[in-house]
């Protein structure tokens, strides 16, 4: 079997500024920080099921990542003609291939229940980058920037080293009744490097734990008994450590699969509440609430009926 797709990996879009009171000599001034861009990937997946061992499936994903991102830091003197404003700009372009492997084993029992065990592994990835660095000064003329001088310009090559990761999981299902699942993941972010620099005091290995369950009271009963009720919990130690404090995350979710047709079409609704970070050591904790809606169709499209 074969499958493909195009998905975003990351998106950067921010602007932040810090203004200072007006000074009698230099006037007002402020620092401005900005960034934009993103990385996308094209995926091609292949799966194979050996004829001599049909309970096992093997998969390979080949991914091509590409994109660019830009960030800048500006010191601005908008009210003074005697002081030059300055800006530092960084432009990065990336292009690289990445591969990951997966296996799945499924055992069906005589009563119709099924046990599924899966594992995946993402290889470490070397990403070459094209880097542009520019530092220049400018002044304002009626709020229009006029470039005065290029202080420094560099065009170099570098690299990003993405770490290996793997995950394992299992699920047990009783068809049209219930399903429970557990999975564990690990990513070696302590080995991440950007332009040859590692960040051992900030980045650490990340462990994730997830558990979930789905229950259908009676698919032949009334409407509320046909609803799929879902519950899940997730926890990750986090890849960041700030001020010697781990930035972990925990969340719980509740969902419903609402049937709207006999063929199996559903409207899926979920609600997730979680916490990320901590208030210890003068840090910030984020409490978030997510709501999602999706639609799954299992109707027979493009089916030509014999009788109208």
Kindly label every feature range from the protein language model.
Residues 1-308:
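Subset of outer-membrane beta-barrel
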């Amino acid at each position: 079997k074969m499958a493909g797709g195009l998905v975003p990996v990351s998106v950067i879009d921010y602007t932040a500024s810090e203004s200072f009171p007006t000074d009698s000599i230099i006037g007002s001034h402020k620092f401005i920080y900005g960034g934009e861009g993103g990385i996308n990937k094209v995926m091609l997946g292949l799966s194979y099921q050996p004829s001599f061992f049909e309970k096992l499936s093997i998969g390979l994903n080949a991914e091509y990542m590409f994109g660019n991102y830009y960030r800048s830091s500006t010191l601005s003197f908008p009210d003074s003609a005697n002081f030059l404003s300055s800006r530092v700009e960084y432009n990065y372009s990336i292009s690289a291939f990445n591969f990951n492997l997966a296996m799945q084993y499924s055992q069906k029992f005589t009563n119709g229940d099924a046990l599924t065990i899966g594992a995946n592994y993402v290889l470490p990835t070397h990403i070459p980058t094209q880097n542009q660095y520019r530092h220049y000064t400018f002044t304002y003329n009626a709020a229009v920037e006029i470039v005065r001088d290029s202080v420094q310009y560099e065009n170099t090559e570098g690299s990003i080293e993405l770490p290996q990761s793997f995950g394992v999981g299992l699920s047990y299902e009783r068809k049209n009744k219930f399903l429970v699942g557990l999975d564990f993941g690990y990513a070696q972010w302590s080995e991440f490097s950007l332009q040859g620099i590692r960040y051992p005091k900030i980045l650490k290995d990340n462990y994730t734990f997830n558990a979930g369950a789905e229950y259908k009271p009676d698919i032949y009963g009334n409407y509320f008994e046909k609803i799929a009720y879902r519950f899940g919990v997730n926890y990750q130690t986090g890849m960041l450590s700030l001020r010697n404090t781990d930035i972990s995350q925990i969340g719980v979710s509740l969902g419903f699969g609402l049937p709207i047709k006999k063929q199996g079409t559903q409207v899926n609704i979920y609600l997730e509440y979680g916490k990320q970070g901590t208030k210890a050591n003068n840090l910030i904790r984020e409490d978030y609430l997510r709501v999602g809606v999706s639609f799954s169709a299992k109707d027979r499209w493009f089916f030509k009926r014999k009788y109208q």
